Curated annotation (Swiss-Prot):
The gene is astB. Homodimer. Disulfide bonds: none annotated. It catalyses: N(2)-succinyl-L-arginine + 2 H2O + 2 H(+) = N(2)-succinyl-L-ornithine + 2 NH4(+) + CO2. This is N-succinylarginine dihydrolase. InterPro entries: AstB_sf (IPR037031), SuccinylArg_d-Hdrlase_AstB (IPR007079). It comes from the Bacteria. It comes from Pseudomonas entomophila (strain L48). The keyword Ribonucleoprotein does not apply. Residues 23-43 are annotated as: Disordered. Keywords: Arginine metabolism, Hydrolase.
């Protein structure tokens, strides 16, 4: 039976803004308070989806969340009508209103961790929504994320969904941004690679000193247990704390893997040789041939990697066995990175082509091509069980562009977040979107009695 990797990209929400909410994310911090263009952001994301679909890759779409999150503000003590809640929050606690308006759910690499059926004990595709406990504005996402994923992957014979891990720092879980999978073919058993920043309960593990380590070893282990993964198909690795302190807040900012290939920076991990040895041995036991592509710090510094998002790229397998690397425009604008990429594609390795996309609206908030997509490896029968409304087609692309142009503003600043009309616009747009994508009532405003 055929098998595929399907990339489900996050659709940028109507409240996309530069709130500077993500401490440890250099781009998010440095672009704080700039004016944003939600319409352009959504169009840039859709253009990438369309281009990859037209190149023959399986492509889906993941809906954004309801923002501002009025229920979250009510939990923090703001009362009155929805409009009054917004106005009171704007007057008394603007940072809380900004957080409740964040469109950060567009970075669906953080939506969940996904294990394909070939790896799991019960032979189903498993999803665990990420609690994103490290940042308040993201910690409020997982209930809606779970409902949206449940509406997309609803057949319980094929798909299994788990609640987010306990919402405490010891089980901080950032989803697929700290997880990748190696395999000979997508439908065959593989090796799942979990990368963590610290241990919650074992002080012998080093930890970063400046920025928080968002993923714990204990969270990664819990997800592996929930998904029914066997020890011979799992490798845990600690990310280098020094690079976290340089702005590498998720592992997908310093490495990316696909198939039998790991593309990584020399400074990405602690005990790199041991990690690579485990990956090689465990993948070999599954019939695979692991290949590591190390980018030396002499060619590309960690600072270059963070500025360009070289590793926050998509590594995609072509029909002929070669690979395509999808990178943001910022890579072309960095001389050292662009020189390295030219060498990479000409040296006879698996990466044969680099494709550049303009994702500036997302990049200025610290999210590149890899942040915008959730990978789901599916066999042919499993793909047939996915809600067809979320699979990208030329027709769906056209419909979504028209939907964006109809509902999204082309300018959004902090003061605009206090406008109750923005909430009305967002709810109107999302109500229409659930009909376009055939999701049913997944948003809180649709579920109120």
């Amino acid at each position: 039976m055929k098998s595929f990797e399907v990339n489900f990209d996050g659709l940028v929400g109507p409240t996309h803004n530069y709130g500077g909410l993500s401490y440890g994310n250099v781009a998010s911090q440095s672009n704080s308070q700039q004016g944003s263009n939600p319409r352009e952001a959504a169009r840039q994301g859709l253009a990438k989806m369309k281009a990859l679909m037209e190149m023959g890759f399986k492509q889906g779409v993941l809906a954004p969340q309801e923002r501002p999150d009025i229920a979250a503000l009510r939990r923090l003590g703001f009362t009155g009508s929805d409009a009054e809640v917004i106005q009171r929050a704007a007057k008394d606690a603007m940072p809380l209103l900004v957080a409740s308006c964040s469109a950060s759910s567009m970075w669906v690499a953080n939506a969940a961790t996904v294990s394909p059926s070939a790896d799991t004990a019960d032979g189903r595709v498993h999803f665990t929504a990420a609690n994103l406990n490290c940042k308040y504005h993201r910690s409020i996402e997982h209930p809606t994320t779970s409902r949206v994923l449940g509406a997309m992957f609803s057949d319980e014979k094929v798909f299994a969904h788990h609640e987010a891990l306990p919402a405490v720092a010891q089980f901080g879980d950032e989803g697929a941004a700290n997880h990748t999978r190696f395999c000979r073919a997508y439908g065959e058993a593989g090796v799942e690679f979990f990368v963590y920043g610290r241990s919650a309960f074992d002080s012998r593990y080093p930890a970063p000193q400046k920025y928080p380590a968002r993923q714990t070893l204990e969270a990664s282990q819990a997800v592996a247990r929930l998904h029914g993964l066997s020890d011979d198909g799992v490798v845990y690795a600690q990310q280098n704390p020094a690079v976290i302190d340089q702005g590498v807040f998720h592992n997908d900012v310093i490495s990316v893997g696909n198939g039998e290939v790991l593309f990584y920076h020399e400074d990405a991990f602690l005990e790199t040789d041991a990690v690579l040895g485990q990956l090689q041995a465990k993948l070999a036991s599954k019939g695979g041939n692991f290949k590591g592509i190390c980018v030396p710090r002499a060619a590309v510094t960690v600072e270059d990697a963070v500025r360009s998002y070289l590793f926050n790229s998509q590594l995609l397998s072509r029909e002929d066995g070669s690979m395509l690397l999808v990178v943001p425009e910022e890579c072309r604008n960095n001389e050292r990175v662009w020189t390295y990429l030219g060498q990479l594609t000409s040296q006879g390795g698996p990466v044969k082509e680099v494709k550049v996309f303009d994702l500036k609206q997302s990049m200025q908030n610290g999210g590149g091509p890899a942040c915008l997509r959730l990978r789901v490896a599916l066999k042919e029968n499993e793909l047939a069980a996915v809600n067809p409304g979320v699979i990208m087609t030329a027709s769906l692309y056209d419909t979504l562009v028209q939907w964006v142009d109809k509902h999204y503003r082309d300018r959004l600043g902090e003061a605009d977040l206090a406008d109750p009309q923005l909430l009305v616009e967002c709810r109107t747009a999302l109500d229409e979107l659930t009909q376009i994508l055939k999701l049913g009532s997944v948003y809180p405003f649709q579920r109120q009695p």
